[in-house]
Amino acid sequence: LALTLPWVLFPTPTSRWLNNRLLTLQNWFIGRFGHELFTPVNLPGHKWAVLLTSLMLFLISLNMLGLLPYTFTPTTQLSLNMGLAFPLWLATVIIGMRNQPTEALGHLLPEGTPTLLIPVLIVIETISLFIRP
């Protein structure tokens, strides 16, 4: 299963007018995967479709390597996970701050906070924002 997965997941381009069954199945799988991933996301968020779909297919194929005996999956390394997660996290935080600054800053203070706790909670929430990746 792990050896055939890259062959099944990634379609090969062809110059034919009509696709064969395997290429049609591959394109259907990738299209369906993208549809399922972005059904709950609004229309401006669909510009992330290519990046997130390719990232998910990459992670699936790397994790399928773990099915092979005596192999080590690269996703167990923290350096690979941080290398993939940190730029995406930073991009979403920066885009959120740029597009909706009041709502993004509003997440730094929970509703109903007593006045004496406001400075402390803003510092705590800011630290927790940067600890997330």
From Swiss-Prot:
What SUPFAM superfamilies does this protein's entry cite? F1F0 ATP synthase subunit A
Cellular component GO terms held in the UniProt record: mitochondrial inner membrane; proton-transporting ATP synthase complex
Biological process (GO) annotations held by this record are:
proton motive force-driven ATP synthesis; proton transmembrane transport
Give the matching Pfam families: ATP-synt_A (PF00119)
Cite the InterPro entries for this sequence. ATP_synth_F0_asu, ATP_synth_F0_asu_bact/mt, F0_ATP_A_sf
- Which terms are listed as keywords in the entry? ATP synthesis, CF(0), Hydrogen ion transport, Ion transport, Membrane, Mitochondrion, Mitochondrion inner membrane, Transmembrane, Transmembrane helix, Transport
Family per UniProt? Belongs to the ATPase A chain family.
| Name listed for the protein in its UniProt record | ATP synthase F(0) complex subunit a
Q: Which organism is it from?
A: Thunnus obesus (Bigeye tuna)
